[in-house]
Amino acid sequence: MRAQVLKQYDDHLTAPSWVDLENVPDPKIEKASDVIVRIGGAGVCRTDLHIIEGVWREATDADRTLLPLIMGHENAGWIEDVGSEVEGLKKGDPVIVHPKITGGTCLACRRGHDMHGENGMFPGVDCNGGYAEALKTSVRNIVKLPQTLVPKEVAAYS
């Protein structure tokens, strides 16, 4: 699949080559709760520029192993594939993707505050995101949309 890949940080957003369009492996179902979303739209915000600038480098990439990274944390699209435990979703369903993947078992998650979950990943920030043709996430992060909503028009709301 094609993806927009961040290759190096650029403190001043001056280099034209900090992001490249590349062919990368398609995401694969690995866990029973995994969902693959075919991306229909991905938002761009100041967070993305902060990632390029390396503002959060010490928090998300202290050991300097994160790059290359597929950015994009505001995503919507259509279900492409689901793991064996996923119910109520089928290929082609329009969805919006909650930006943080969490386990759902820590106290914060059980209280409904999963943005503060202990064992989370943030696609597009500290693992591959949605500036690609497809994104792997968890069923916990999927919100099914009505057929009347177009993913590219709602992606930035995720």
Residue ranges and their predicted role:
Residues 1-2:
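Extreme N-terminal starter segment of soluble prokaryotic enzymes
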Residues 25-43, 57-107, 141-149:
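Glycine-rich beta-strand-centered segment in the early N-terminal region that forms part
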Residues 5-29, 46-81, 96, 114-128:
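N-terminal glycine-rich cofactor-binding segment
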Residues 64-66, 73, 103-158:
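NAD(P)H dinucleotide-binding glycine-rich loop of Rossmann-like/cofactor-binding domains
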